[in-house]
């Protein structure tokens, strides 16, 4: 019998036997063993009939213990020569000493104490011996017998010692794979579990504490071994429950997570490590998820593929999907935060791929997860902020599949721009015209307050058109007298805002990082690659073809492989996702016809019966609709005419509410179903806000339509639409468009008649409109000048019906210039849907659409003055993330202010102009606006920890960098010299943050953020003009 404590301590304190005669050691070892054998035989029932089981005198047990201690010491210290066994080890093997000692333990009461003694003995042998003991079956066999006898034990102490020994054995296996065969065949009677040490570890996979961690570490040794040994991989996949236990264990651990998180304060929007370390159940789940990530990283492809399939079908689909659609907002918000945390914690592409496939392709109750997540951005709850944080994580992955489904697939056809503008997609803005226009949107009322400028830089100026940063591309060096005013962002002799230099540096770094990550993308997305016509054709041809298990590449996958898989969602999203009613996912009867989801059967026999929206949508809608204030609709049947649009919404609110759950509504009617929109939400009602930029537009003659007739000016110059008198002309094209659907939808005739009646009601001018009480969070009132303009507009609307025919003629000539592809039916509708679509047409490519995500983000951005600070910080972060992508389609859509889009598509520039107008309107009615602006700026500076962040963080969420996946380097770390101007302001507000009055808190913080946002966008526009020809091989040299 061996006493583990005394044996271990004595062996550790023993003197080394180096220099002692090996023969002497051998004689001592044999003498000790002879004494032990006498005692063993005395109590062996086979050799002594008087021996009784379990009855061993204490003195004899102690004697065996002392002899075995010395024997183990001699065996461990023996040094072998020339890879041969030492005499002591040879004697141990020949006499089968280890098996006899194990049987001796069994003859006694085989208690937990006895098991622990045996386990510790073998742990010392395998870790401290100078010879490879495990190569010998007489030593390995009793070890396996011991391990088998310990399986199924419930004593924590025994489990701890068992896992420690298993961890040591796996470590030896990883270093010496030659003994693997012995482990497989030593215990042949184990059957399917003949790889015993692996099978014993499986129950401890999800165990918490040090036992679980050691078990997972041991399994990782086996996983790395499987990568080089196909036999091990096949055994694990075919004969063990490793992958099912690992995947379904995630489901069990997830069920123990809190369904509602403790209130973290208004700034909280995502789970950081400091948060989840306080939740033991979440720590346990994250440990298991991290282990899955590690297994997929090092294991054989057979194991990797089986594991990701089990995680998808055993955790994501049956557990996470329903959790994302719980009834209460708190539960949905918590699940969304968990999903965001999971995405940020995963580093292995294969595991990340199935999470992305789940988000982008999976349908829950016939609604794609992506559609549901997108719709929640427009909610008034904190769910909005958590959803924005999730999309920030998704966009930050720089994954082609994600960007293709969110944005690019809607831009590839190029139908959002005029046909004559397609050449401008690849245009290089060498003279920084777009940056100048973006900076020109800075409201005059926001130019005062805290300045971020160094006084000694009054002579600093930058001629951005020199393109000095790009040495590999064409170098343009025009003479100074040749510069136009827009070529120089900073006027000569004018002090330069030092924070703008930091924005430039940050933009340079972010764009380079994004370009480096996008090198593996399958296409350039520049208007030609992928070819728009081929892309549309591939979607049309493959739209009705379903894949039993969709292939989801990350990120090298070709777009035509990913596109058709989301064809059903495209159909639905075009007709259903452009709502003000953010939870109105009322599924039309043609929503998922023709192109089944990734795991649906291919059966399209005819139009399905109308179905109600999913239950979770119906329940959450009851609360969401009551609080939601409205948002910008990218494409409406009223051409963004806010007053008409609002009146129609107010007048039809009850009728539309009753018909929301009816099936197969026409697009025109669906567009009419909206919620009340704030009066200042949408196009500008004043002619003043864009004068600077518009004069620059005309002065530079940058509009490609300048040489053409300008009758339909509001359509051809969408940027000028806010200040043009288009309230009368804009309904005419839409009225004609609606009339094209009259044959299939008689209801649209009533809509047009109703619309005409509303125009008549506007004859009384804007006063009647202002008498209505609209729920706006801020007193954004029209000034007298604007009211006069509304009156003049009302007078012009009296003549609207007389001019209707002329306007329709103009529109006929206008649409003749549109791209031919815009007139074809939607490629996202399968051919099998042709008959059904004749009765239930969906949105076609003749109605340009930039996607639900862009629509809802711009919608939320346009309500910037009503959003909380944290919503605006996340929105700004997402838009700047998108603007950092080098793909010309996306870059031109967001940053090219010269691009002329279709009348129904609003650009980021127009939304920013609308925000500018709202800020100026608010400033005109707020008496203490300058003082409140200074307080707001001081508050923002107070939030920035100047010890590790620069003023560029004014438009960044302080948590954003900490939670971003990828490099841990803070991109906002700037030169110390740049920080000096802000340290003074930091000390001024160090005692307590300024206390902004609650009624004006959100508008004032938005007004303080807006100029910084414009600087960041302008910096991105300028850096793109320099880096668009960057050689890929120079990325590493350029990135700091």
UniProtKB/Swiss-Prot annotation:
Region described as Disordered: 555-613, 653-746, 769-808
Biased composition (Basic and acidic residues): 653-664, 696-719, 783-804
One Gene Ontology biological process: protein localization to perinuclear region of cytoplasm
Domain of life of the native organism: Eukaryota
Sequence ranges of Polar residues compositional bias: 677-690
Similarity section: Belongs to the FHIP family.
Function per UniProt: Probable component of the FTS/Hook/FHIP complex (FHF complex). FHF complex promotes the distribution of AP-4 complex to the perinuclear area of the cell.
Oligomeric and partner information: May be a component of the FTS/Hook/FHIP complex (FHF complex), composed of AKTIP/FTS, FHIP1B, and one or more members of the Hook family of proteins HOOK1, HOOK2, and HOOK3. May interact directly with AKTIP/FTS.
Protein name per the record: FHF complex subunit HOOK-interacting protein 1A
Protein species of origin: Homo sapiens
């Amino acid at each position: 019998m061996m006493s583990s404590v005394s044996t271990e301590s004595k062996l550790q304190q023993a003197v080394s036997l180096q220099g002692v005669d090996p023969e002497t050691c051998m004689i001592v070892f044999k003498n000790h063993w002879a004494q032990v054998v006498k005692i063993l035989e005395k109590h062996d029932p086979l050799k002594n009939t008087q021996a009784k089981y379990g009855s061993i005198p204490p003195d004899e047990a102690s004697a065996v213990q002392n002899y075995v201690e010395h024997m183990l010491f001699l065996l461990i210290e023996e040094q072998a020569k020339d890879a041969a066994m030492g005499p002591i080890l040879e004697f141990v093997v020949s006499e089968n000493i280890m098996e006899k000692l194990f049987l001796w333990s069994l003859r006694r009461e085989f208690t937990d104490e006895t098991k622990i003694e045996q386990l510790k003995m073998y742990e010392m042998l395998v870790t401290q011996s100078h010879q490879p003991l495990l190569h010998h079956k007489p030593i390995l066999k009793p070890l396996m017998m011991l391990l088998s006898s310990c399986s199924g034990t419930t004593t924590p102490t025994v489990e701890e010692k068992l896992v420690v020994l298993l961890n040591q054995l796996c470590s030896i296996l990883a270093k010496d794979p030659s003994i693997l065969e012995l482990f497989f065949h030593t215990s042949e009677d184990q059957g399917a579990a003949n790889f015993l040490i692996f099978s014993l570890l499986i129950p401890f996979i999800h165990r918490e504490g040090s036992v679980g961690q050691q078990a997972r570490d041991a399994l990782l040794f086996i996983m790395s071994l499987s990568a080089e040994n196909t036999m091990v991989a096949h055994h694990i996949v075919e004969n063990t429950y490793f992958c099912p236990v690992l995947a379904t264990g995630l489901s069990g651990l997830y069920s123990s997570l809190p369904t509602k998180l403790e209130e973290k304060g208004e700034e909280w929007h995502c789970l950081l490590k400091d948060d989840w370390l306080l939740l033991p159940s979440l720590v346990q789940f994250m440990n298991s998820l991290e282990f899955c990530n590690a297994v997929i990283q090092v294991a054989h492809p057979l194991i990797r593929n089986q594991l990701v399939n089990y995680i998808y079908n055993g955790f994501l689909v049956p557990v996470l999907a329903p959790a994302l659609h719980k009834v209460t907002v708190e539960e949905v918000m918590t699940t969304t935060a968990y999903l965001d945390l999971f995405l940020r914690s995963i580093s292995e592409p294969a595991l990340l791929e199935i999470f992305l496939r789940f988000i982008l392709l999976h349908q829950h109750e016939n609604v794609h997860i992506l559609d549901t997540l997108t719709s929640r951005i427009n909610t008034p709850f904190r769910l909005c902020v958590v959803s924005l944080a999730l999309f920030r994580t998704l966009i930050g992955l720089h994954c082609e599949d994600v960007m293709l489904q969110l944005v690019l697939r809607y831009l590839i056809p190029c139908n959002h721009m005029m046909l004559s503008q397609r050449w401008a997609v690849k245009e290089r803005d060498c003279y920084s015209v777009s940056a100048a226009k973006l900076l020109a949107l800075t409201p005059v009322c926001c130019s005062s307050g805290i300045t971020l400028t160094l006084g000694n830089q009054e002579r600093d100026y930058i001629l951005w058109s020199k393109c000095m940063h790009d040495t590999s591309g064409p170098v343009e060096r025009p003479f100074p007298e040749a510069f136009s005013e827009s070529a120089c962002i900073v006027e000569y002799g004018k002090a330069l805002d030092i924070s703008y230099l930091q924005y430039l540096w940050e933009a340079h770094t972010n764009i380079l990082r994004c370009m480096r990550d996008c090198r593996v993308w399958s296409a350039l997305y520049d208007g030609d690659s992928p070819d728009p016509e081929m892309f549309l054709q591939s979607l049309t041809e493959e739209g009705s073809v379903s894949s039993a298990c969709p292939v989801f590449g990350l990120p090298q996958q070709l777009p035509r492989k990913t596109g058709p898989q989301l064809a059903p969602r495209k159909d639905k999203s075009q007709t259903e996702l452009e709502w003000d009613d953010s939870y109105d996912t009322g599924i039309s009867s043609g929503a998922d016809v023709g192109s089944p989801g990734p795991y649906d059967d291919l059966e399209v026999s005819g139009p399905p019966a109308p179905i109600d929206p999913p239950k979770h949508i119906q329940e959450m809608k009851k609360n969401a609709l009551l609080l939601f204030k409205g948002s910008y609709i990218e494409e409406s049947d009223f051409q963004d005419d806010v007053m008409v649009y609002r009146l129609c919404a107010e007048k039809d609110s009850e009728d539309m509410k009753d018909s929301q759950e009816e099936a197969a509504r026409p697009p025109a009617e669906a567009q009419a179903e909206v919620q009340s929109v704030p009066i200042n939400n949408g196009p500008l009602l004043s002619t003043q806000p864009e004068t600077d930029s518009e004069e620059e537009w005309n002065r530079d003659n940058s509009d490609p339509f300048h040489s053409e007739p300008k009758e339909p000016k509001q359509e051809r110059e969408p940027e000028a639409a806010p200040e043009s008198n288009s309230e009368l002309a804009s309904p005419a094209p839409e009225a004609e468009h609606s009339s094209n659907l009259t044959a299939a939808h008689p209801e649209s005739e009533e809509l047009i008649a109703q619309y005409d009646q509303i125009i008549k009601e506007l004859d009384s001018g804007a006063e009647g409109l202002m008498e209505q009480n609209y729920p706006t969070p801020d007193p954004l009132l029209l000034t007298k000048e604007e009211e006069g303009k509304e009156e003049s507009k009302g007078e012009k609307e009296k003549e609207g019906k007389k001019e209707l025919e002329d306007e329709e003629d103009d529109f006929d000539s206008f649409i003749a210039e549109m791209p031919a592809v815009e007139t074809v039916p939607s490629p996202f509708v399968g051919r099998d849907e042709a008959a059904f679509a004749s009765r239930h047409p969906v949105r076609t490519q003749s109605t340009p659409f930039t996607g639900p995500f862009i629509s809802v983000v711009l919608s939320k951005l346009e309500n910037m003055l009503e959003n909380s600070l944290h919503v605006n910080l996340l929105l700004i972060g997402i838009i700047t993330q998108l603007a950092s992508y080098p793909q010309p389609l996306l870059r031109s859509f967001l940053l090219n202010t010269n691009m002329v889009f279709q009348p129904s598509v609003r650009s980021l520039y127009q939304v920013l102009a609308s925000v500018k107008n709202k800020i100026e309107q608010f400033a005109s009615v707020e008496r203490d606006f300058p003082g409140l602006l200074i307080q707001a700026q001081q508050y923002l500076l107070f939030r920035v920890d100047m010890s590790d962040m620069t003023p560029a963080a004014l438009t960044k969420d302080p948590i954003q960098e900490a939670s971003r996946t990828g490099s841990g380097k803070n991109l906002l770390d700037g030169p110390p010299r740049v920080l000096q101007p802000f340290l003074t302001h930091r000390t001024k507000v160090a005692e307590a943050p300024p206390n902004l009055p609650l009624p004006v808190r959100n508008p004032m913080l938005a007004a303080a953020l807006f100029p910084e946002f414009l600087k960041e966008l302008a910096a991105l526009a300028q850096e793109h003009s320099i880096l668009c020809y960057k050689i890929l091989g120079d990325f590493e040299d350029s990135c700091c």
